[in-house]
Amino acid sequence: MLDNVLRIATRQSPLALWQAHYVKDALMAKHPGLTVELVPMVTRGDVILDTPLAKVGGKGLFVKELEVALLENRADIAVHSMKDVPVEFPQGLGLVTICEREDPRDAFVSNKYASLDELPAGSIVGTSSLRRQCQLAERRPDLIIRSLRGNVGTRLSKLDNGEYDAIILAVAGLKRLGLESRIRDALPPEVSLPAVGQGAVGIECRLDDTRTRELLAALNHPETALRVTAERAMNTRLEGGCQVPIGSYAELIGGEIWLRALVGAPDGSQMIRGERRGSPQDAEKMGISLAEELLNNGARAILADVYNGDAPV
């Protein structure tokens, strides 16, 4: 980083800019005198909007350009929604800080119906996520699930135009954009298990940039970091790309981590679930062991079909 100036690489969507400003404000509050600049960028994920994410490379499309900016020293940190962060990082880069988690649940959004259970058979539901799709299809095979891309505002416009009867978004994104009133129902994890890291903001930087890492340390939230560590360890062992039918959610309850996970066929015809409880110090180990249980119980075949494009949808 330059003397007392820290540069944040960010996408230009309203939610990405909210996250970047959130980190900027937190850094300036912790380090008075620090100047923080935003470096807005357009990623491939922002440009390719007419194709489902699973077919164009997954959510890593939202991250790559930001990482190139870090490697070329055009920025010092990149701020990500943790559910968009791929399993692996380019050499020399890494995730060094995880901020306090917002509500991780999925949101049911509709202008006509108050809940998922109220949707009549044949209703059209929009989501861009195979994870949400497989859980919806299992619970309500009578619904029509259609792909829905674009930023939050675009997705809400498509709902308001009557293209969908309901859409599923993240509670955290709607709250951060001041759109909490659009949430008709927050879906509990038993109904829609969240994505790995959902609701958490992560910060990536060059691993050899000691000064930046020292500045970021004050923003790390240990409880969130533990929970996300367990979720990401499971996802890493599953070799889960960013656009796969994998859900994972860890809670800290009474000094124990409770980790739940699932892998589902996109059409909801198969769902492999599992859970673990254990000591926070074993967060990573628990994630790996739960992933291995899922793989042995049928997740390996489901994921192979998804990656090969053979999965029923």
UniProtKB/Swiss-Prot annotation:
Keywords: Porphyrin biosynthesis, Transferase
Gene Ontology BP terms: protoporphyrinogen IX biosynthetic process
Enzyme Commission code(s) on record: 2.5.1.61
Cofactor binding, per record: Binds 1 dipyrromethane group covalently.
Residue numbers of S-(dipyrrolylmethanemethyl)cysteine PTMs: 242
Pfam families xrefs: Porphobil_deam, Porphobil_deamC
Recorded coiled-coil stretches: none
GO cellular component terms attached to this protein's record: cytoplasm
Catalytic activity: 4 porphobilinogen + H2O = hydroxymethylbilane + 4 NH4(+)
Domain of life of the native organism: Bacteria
Cofactor(s) listed in the protein's UniProt record: dipyrromethane
InterPro entries: HemC, Porphobilin_deaminase_cofac_BS, Porphobilin_deaminase_N, Porphobilinogen_deaminase_C, Porphobilinogen_deaminase_C_sf
GO molecular function terms noted in the UniProt entry: hydroxymethylbilane synthase activity
Pathway(s): Porphyrin-containing compound metabolism; protoporphyrin-IX biosynthesis; coproporphyrinogen-III from 5-aminolevulinate: step 2/4
Keyword Transferase annotated: yes
SUBUNIT field: Monomer.
Family: Belongs to the HMBS family.
PANTHER family: PORPHOBILINOGEN DEAMINASE
Leftover remarks: The porphobilinogen subunits are added to the dipyrromethane group.
Functional description taken from the UniProt entry: Tetrapolymerization of the monopyrrole PBG into the hydroxymethylbilane pre-uroporphyrinogen in several discrete steps.
Protein name: Porphobilinogen deaminase
Organism expressing this protein natively: Escherichia fergusonii (strain ATCC 35469 / DSM 13698 / CCUG 18766 / IAM 14443 / JCM 21226 / LMG 7866 / NBRC 102419 / NCTC 12128 / CDC 0568-73)
Originating gene: hemC
